[in-house]
Design a protein with these regions (language model features):
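Hydrophobic transmembrane alpha-helices of multi-pass small-molecule transporters
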Residues: 49-52, 75, 97, 126, ...
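Residue-level micro-sites within transmembrane alpha helices that shape
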Residues: 44-47, 91, 121, 149
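Interfacial aromatic-anchored transmembrane helix boundaries in multi-pass membrane proteins
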Residues: 27-43, 70-100, 130-137
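Short helix-perturbing small/polar motifs within transmembrane alpha-helices
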Residues: 1-27, 87-130
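Membrane-helix interface "capping/anchor" motifs
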Residues: 55-67, 104-111
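Hydrophobic transmembrane alpha-helices
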Residues: 2-57, 61-62
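Membrane-embedded alpha-helical hairpins and interfacial helices in multi-pass inner-membrane proteins
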Residues: 82-87, 102-173
């Protein structure tokens, strides 16, 4: 019996490691994909996309690990985002994961939990942009087209996580 539990744990660890590797690879390749597609990939928030997939399909610890590592990996491989912005994004993504689990524990509603956690963590992020950067930078980050794309992405991410968690596709936390 002990062997079966260990094997199951190893399988989940392998799944988390493979997912983490794929997420990091996607983030490293995102600038090249944006160039090839001639489309601003950041509109779909690649780091948050990886975070949503991690929340849906891997253990909680993996979502936190990706929230903490994806901005750093992006910085190390591409120099973007700059250091202060990287730290803000790291805090935002980590807060996003924490808020999701906190709200979900209170409501048991996946869609509302992820939707609110994304919105609240974005508000936190934009507040820090105002503190650490100029008003002009803040305004460039909150252009109408970008905000609309974020609202669409947030809705799609929330719908996906709702679907995955309610169709037994998610990892049992």
């Amino acid at each position: 019996m002990k062997h079966i539990v260990t094997l199951s744990g190893s399988k989940e660890l392998l799944k988390s490691l493979l997912f983490g590797f794929a997420a990091i690879l996607f983030i490293v390749l995102a600038p090249a994909l944006a160039h090839l597609a001639n489309f601003p990939i950041y509109y779909i928030e690649p780091m948050r996309l990886m975070l949503i997939l991690a929340l849906a399909h891997t253990p909680k610890a993996n979502a936190y690990a990706l929230a903490l590592s994806l901005p750093l990996v992006s910085f190390l491989f591409s120099g973007h985002p700059e250091v202060v912005k990287m730290l803000i994004i790291t805090a935002e993504l980590t807060l996003n994961v924490w808020l999701f689990y906190f709200i979900f524990k209170k409501t048991s509603r996946t869609f509302i939990s992820i939707f609110l956690s994304i919105i609240l963590s974005k508000m936190f992020c934009y507040s820090l942009y105002l503190v650490f950067f100029s008003w002009a930078f803040f305004m460039s980050e909150t252009q109408t087209v970008f905000l609309i794309s974020q609202l669409i992405a947030t809705t799609l991410f929330s719908a996906y996580l709702y679907w995955a968690m309610n169709h037994k596709l998610s990892f049992k936390k």
